[in-house]
Curated annotation (Swiss-Prot):
Name listed for the protein in its UniProt record: Ribulose bisphosphate carboxylase large chain
A GO-annotated cellular component: chloroplast
Alphabetic keyword roster: Calvin cycle, Carbon dioxide fixation, Chloroplast, Disulfide bond, Lyase, Magnesium, Metal-binding, Methylation, Monooxygenase, Oxidoreductase, Photorespiration, Photosynthesis, Plastid
Cofactor stoichiometry and binding remark: Binds 1 Mg(2+) ion per subunit.
Pfam families noted in UniProt: RuBisCO_large, RuBisCO_large_N
Residues modified as N6,N6,N6-trimethyllysine: K4
Note in the entry: The basic functional RuBisCO is composed of a large chain homodimer in a 'head-to-tail' conformation. In form I RuBisCO this homodimer is arranged in a barrel-like tetramer with the small subunits forming a tetrameric 'cap' on each end of the 'barrel'.
Organism: Morus alba (White mulberry)
Binding site for substrate: N113, T163, K167, R285, H317, S369
Entry binding sites for Mg(2+): K191, D193, E194
Subcellular location: Plastid, Chloroplast
Active site residues per record: K165, H284
Gene: rbcL
């Protein structure tokens, strides 16, 4: 018989250093930490095998298919500078292994069982190259950056948001009031907190109604288009869709979803509904740190960001950069570009392992949120540029005079930074000066500067 039973080394079948990658292959870069005594080639081949066609022993049914056509291949291994026990294994997967238009299926294969594999101490997926042939099977973001600007009629500046706090405990009426005050003061958006779904103190339908009222009142008074991210995340897909449908019936511009806790299947369904019905979709990344925080195990956020662009979302939270380490800044800007741009070159200094061509799939606006305030505005404007959403929760609601003045302070600071930049000034060097000048004309901004002045910002 042509079948030899028994266990054999993975590297005999799955380590192929001479392999020329195809344009249609999905390429993955894994950071592998093998158990002591397991050679890199064997560990890399094991990853390729376990995340594609392999199993632990030779099986009779292997003879019924063409392994050459379907197997994953570890085609390159490189050491990691400064880490004795780690290396990067590059794996190529044939396109046929994956269902079209399913992020869920892609992840089930690539980051499925293999992460519990005994021969490895740890495994981290650092980056994925999605071939254009696979990209084209996804609808992607419901609308994208340009369409959003046109819908909102806001150009040439970042958009401003604010998460309504306290995140849990407000009644719907008081919640709506906070929304109105922020929008009236000058913000473009307010946001449901990611944990706000439909709890006993505020059921979703009541919240939607009072927020819609707040939006329309603020729009009428300011002459600007306003939005509130109504969180449609729910315990079942049916309930999630019910909430999205009600939002559409109210005529509001945008809804929101927690894509990791809600799951990619639910998210993609919601994204399709949003495109069909003209709703923008704001994505929150609750649970991402469970997956991406460990340096040697899990998945890097850039992979989750790519997956979201494929599954669909118009905004996604992407960290703030400010006050963090310099290296962190380059890495963050790397995946921010992966979200926004049509074509991104391989650049290891920014953590980008592969050149990615999105073939005109719409882009996603990165959202900077978490612990930022008016003194950060120049840096945020410089780092993120116009195509971003800057969200100040406490930085708006924590204003000593209240929500509306807090919103005014942020809007004045933003407009001052944008104007200064357009006049050719260096925001990195003159940032504090620009904010100080602007605060002479805005008592609201002056008060905000005073409250947060001791929180130093090292650029």
């Amino acid at each position: 018989v042509g079948f030899k039973a028994g266990v054999k080394d993975y590297k005999l079948t799955y380590y192929t250093p001479d392999y020329e990658t195809k344009d249609t292959d999905i390429l993955a870069a894994f950071r592998v930490t093998p158990q002591p005594g397991v050679p890199p080639e064997e560990a890399g081949a094991a990853v390729a095998a376990e995340s594609s066609t392999g199993t632990w022993t030779t099986v009779w049914t292997d003879g019924l298919t063409s392994l050459d056509r379907y197997k994953g291949r570890c085609y390159h291994i490189e050491p990691v500078a400064g880490e004795e026990s780690q290396f990067i294994a590059y794996v190529a997967y044939p396109l046929d292994l994956f269902e079209e238009g399913s992020v869920t299926n892609m992840f089930t294969s690539i980051v499925g069982n293999v992460f519990g594999f005994k021969a490895l101490r740890a495994l981290r997926l650092e980056d994925l190259r999605i071939p254009t042939a696979y990209v084209k099977t996804f609808q992607g973001p419901p609308h994208g950056i340009q369409v959003e600007r046109d819908k909102l009629n806001k150009y040439g500046r970042p958009l401003l948001g604010c998460t309504i706090k306290p995140k849990l405990g407000l009644s719907a009426k008081n919640y709506g009031r906070a929304v109105y005050e922020c929008l009236r003061g000058g913000l473009d958006f307010t946001k449901d907190d990611e944990n706000v779904n439909s709890q006993p103190f505020m059921r979703w339908r009541d919240r939607f109604l009072f927020c819609a009222e707040a939006i329309y009142k603020a729009q009428a008074e300011t002459g600007e288009i306003k939005g509130h991210y109504l969180n449609a995340t729910a315990g079942t897909c049916e309930d999630m869709m019910k909430r999205a449908v009600f939002a559409r019936e109210l005529g509001v511009p945008i809804v929101m979803h927690d894509y990791l806790t809600g799951g990619f299947t639910a998210n993609t369904s919601l994204a399709h509904y949003c495109r069909d019905n003209g709703l923008l979709l704001h994505i929150h990344r609750a649970m991402h740190a469970v997956i991406d925080r460990q340096k040697n195990h899990g998945m890097h956020f850039r992979v989750l960001a790519k997956a979201l662009r494929m599954s669909g979302g118009d905004h996604i939270h992407a960290g703030t950069v400010v006050g963090k380490l310099e290296g962190e800044r380059e890495i963050t800007l790397g995946f921010v570009d992966l979200l926004r741009d049509d074509f991104v070159e391989k650049d290891r200094s920014r953590g980008i392992y592969f050149t990615q061509d999105w073939v005109s799939m719409p882009g996603v606006l990165p959202v900077a949120s978490g612990g930022i305030h008016v003194w950060h505005m120049p840096a945020l404007t410089e780092i993120f540029g116009d195509d971003s959403v800057l969200q100040f929760g406490g930085g708006t609601l924590g204003h000593p005079w209240g929500n509306a003045p807090g919103a005014v302070a942020n809007r004045v600071a933003l407009e001052a930074c944008v104007q200064a930049r357009n006049e050719g000034r260096d925001l990195a060097r003159e940032g504090n000066e620009i904010i100080r000048e602007a605060s002479k004309w805005s008592p609201e901004l002056a008060a905000a500067c005073e409250v947060w002045k001791e929180i130093k910002f090292e650029f």
